């Protein structure tokens, strides 16, 4: 239950570091990324609802790594563009959660469950 309460508390906080969830969702949709609400939930989980140091300093919304190091961007919108590039040739439709699991998007074995929880509890 601690995980659930932590995630809910995280979701109730307000983004103050250059982007709101609405702005991120708009940018995800603008790029035509499939399943935008799942992708937004990923960003919220990866960044602690846009409050993490990686988000604030490096503008990395998705925990994306290049050559084993977390990517740094000059603006958070570049992170959305990079996310699309990372998945565009790999996602061929179907269950997006299964896709994320198949490609090993995150090392946390509970990652998909956490993303689903965010989608469900925040009416995404």
Indicate residue ranges for each PLM-predicted region.
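Catalytic cores of secreted/periplasmic lytic hydrolases that degrade extracellular macromolecules
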Residues: 2-6, 11-124
